[in-house]
Amino acid sequence: MSKMTKKMKKICEIKSSLKDYKFNNLISILNSFPKAKFNENIDVAINLRINTKKSDQNIRGSIILPNSIKKEKYIVVFASGEDKKNAYEAGANLAGMEEVSDKIKNNKKLKIDHVISTPEAMPIVEKLGSILGPKGLMPNPKLGTITKDIKNEIKKIKSGQLNYKNDKYGIIHTTIGKINFNNLELKINLLYFLNHLVKTKPTNLKGVFIKKVSLSTTMGGSVIINHNEFLQENNISDNIKK
């Protein structure tokens, strides 16, 4: 069995000394963990009570949080003619048709954050399924990434739009803030996301939808919050059973 690092020991000591993981304590708790030398993300993991083997219970979508987490994104657009021109004007890093496909095939280490496609270009994109699919980069109409409104989609991405989907265990992982956010900024973002998420609850799913919510920093430990109390205090219903 491997030895616990000094950093992990410190995190465990802090967590074991705490008895109250209410939201208002979270920023101070996360800030008390050993820090990295950069402005770490604050990530959320949300365990959902869904059956991932049923296609109608899988959750995916996109959202722009009130307090944006903007960062530079490498955006690839599959389009031609005027749509290609619009893509570059809106800030795409790479746009085109077959030439873009060839570049991706020949440089599999290319760090791409988002791929957008016009409907007409999808036959080219589909041939890249084995490369883009495992990275979660395939354009999808539910996410708005198959569109003729290229400029608007790029604008949303650059404004901090987050894409999310559950993994095979029914857990959604995404970022809701930075370690330099204050308590109110983080609270607003988490509330906004949870309220949005509750509205995506499958119609055939009865009872509790959200099972567990935990927050963590990029390099630190995670803390489970009392999400039922948090939701109720802010008048968000998850059909919580008493």
UniProtKB/Swiss-Prot annotation:
Checking PROSITE patterns in the record gives: RIBOSOMAL_L1 (PS01199)
Q: Does the keyword RNA-binding apply?
A: yes
Which CDD domains does its entry note?
Answer: Ribosomal_L1
Which GO-annotated molecular functions does the record name? rRNA binding; structural constituent of ribosome; tRNA binding
Disulfide bonds, which pairs?
Answer: none
Assigned GO CC terms: cytosolic large ribosomal subunit
Q: Which Gene3D superfamilies match?
A: 3.30.190.20, 3.40.50.790
Q: Which UniProt keywords apply?
A: Repressor, Ribonucleoprotein, Ribosomal protein, RNA-binding, rRNA-binding, Translation regulation, tRNA-binding
Which processes are annotated in GO (biological process)? regulation of translation; translation
Q: Does the keyword Nucleotide-binding apply?
A: no
Give the family per the record: Belongs to the universal ribosomal protein uL1 family.
Under the heading NCBIfam families, the entry gives: rplA_bact
Which HAMAP family does this one have? Answer: Ribosomal_uL1_B (MF_01318_B)
Q: What does this protein do?
A: Binds directly to 23S rRNA. The L1 stalk is quite mobile in the ribosome, and is involved in E site tRNA release.
Quaternary form? Part of the 50S ribosomal subunit.
Q: What is this protein called?
A: Large ribosomal subunit protein uL1
Query: What does the record give as the organism's lineage?
Result: Bacteria, Pseudomonadati, Pseudomonadota, Gammaproteobacteria, Enterobacterales
